Amino acid sequence: MAAEIICVGTEILLGDIVNSNSQYLAQEFAKLGISHYFQSVVGDNIARIHSLLEIAVQRGTEIIVFTGGLGPTPDDLTTEAIAAYFQTPLIERPEIVADITTKFAQRGRTMTPNNRKQALLPEGAEILPNPTGTAPGLIWQPIEGLTIFTFPGVPGEMKRMWQETAVPYLKAQGYGQIVIHSEMMRFRGIGESSLAAKVNHLFALTNPTVAPYASKGEVKLRVAARAESVAAAKKLMDPVVAEIKAIAGLDYFGSDGASLPLVIGDLLRTRQETLAVAESCTGGGLGALITSVSGSSDYFLGGITAYANAVKINLLGVNSADLQNQGAVSETVAQQMALGAKQALDSDWGIGITGIAGPKSDDSAKPIGLVCIAWADPQNHVFSHTYRYGTDRDRELIRYLSACDALDGLRRYLKSDKS
């Protein structure tokens, strides 16, 4: 079963709004076992909508889901375009007019004449009710082997209509007997090409499938399988997932929603240990990542943003001679910051970060992207590492990667039980 998504709206093309509808519908297709290979965005233009319909029909698409362009204004052209393409007249549906009139009355308003446009559907189309808005959608089979759905572009309206009407309709047609289940495996400390080389033999699999994805600050592998149930799909996937974990080792940190801050929190909570941080170049970004997890106060005591050298000396106990001789960006200073945070806040673990995020460097001998990170364990053993993110990356990315590597380094120490 081949389906595709066509999102209509010039505002999407201009980047004025984020197209979250495609992501949602793609995930819903997978739950119903419906494969889809194409997504398109088109402006409010009948000729361009026709061109996409022509392509979809020619390649034998069986389900087309449109979102957007169903409202009462002149630029809402989706229904008109679909009807014209299949040379079918538009018929005003009195039940839709009545529904729109009622909704206006409930809001203490009178329906304006242009709203009647939303009651026009192609002859033979089934109404797809909109419980909250005034623009209904449609379900229509204009030619043999093709079903068209239309939905408003408003995500909340679209999602409710999909769940309450489209999903039951599709299940009644026999869809949903096969599901597509997937697991997004997440990795740190290894590049996409390096990971791909290690698992290259798995890319030839057909069920389950394995596909790599690059993401900000991490690499992902999507393992997916088709089966009659989620449990059956997982049974197909489990050996492959286990093999990937064995190959990746500590570079694998979790799957799906298991973010680095969440993983760190679980590890610290399990060990009943606490964390404090001292930050310079990240300016509180590390603390922000940690506290993005609800309940992080169970293990995160706090942080000190020590941007000035005087703060490093007075609050963290960094040796002034080391600052003078080695500079603020050095592993020696990062180590003292980690110990200083740990001692100042009486935590089990401490992290210190100092670096040059750019766009300029105050030290000609130290390039932009040079960051030193240190970790102090419960026994006051200190570990450190120097990262070189490159001079071509922007300030915010360097700060973000630094915070992520600080967490990832702690994760590796905790997982290796080096404390």
UniProtKB/Swiss-Prot annotation:
CDD domains: cinA. SUPFAM superfamilies: CinA-like (SSF142433), Molybdenum cofactor biosynthesis proteins (SSF53218). Transmembrane segments: none annotated. InterPro entries: CinA (IPR050101), CinA-like_C (IPR036653), CinA_C (IPR008136), CinA_KH (IPR041424), Competence-induced_CinA (IPR008135), MoaB/Mog-like_dom_sf (IPR036425), MoaB/Mog_dom (IPR001453). Pfam families: CinA, CinA_KH, MoCF_biosynth. NCBIfam families: cinA_nterm, PncC_domain, PRK00549.1. PANTHER family: NICOTINAMIDE-NUCLEOTIDE AMIDOHYDROLASE PNCC, NMN AMIDOHYDROLASE-LIKE PROTEIN YFAY. Belongs to the CinA family. This is CinA-like protein. It comes from Picosynechococcus sp. (strain ATCC 27264 / PCC 7002 / PR-6).
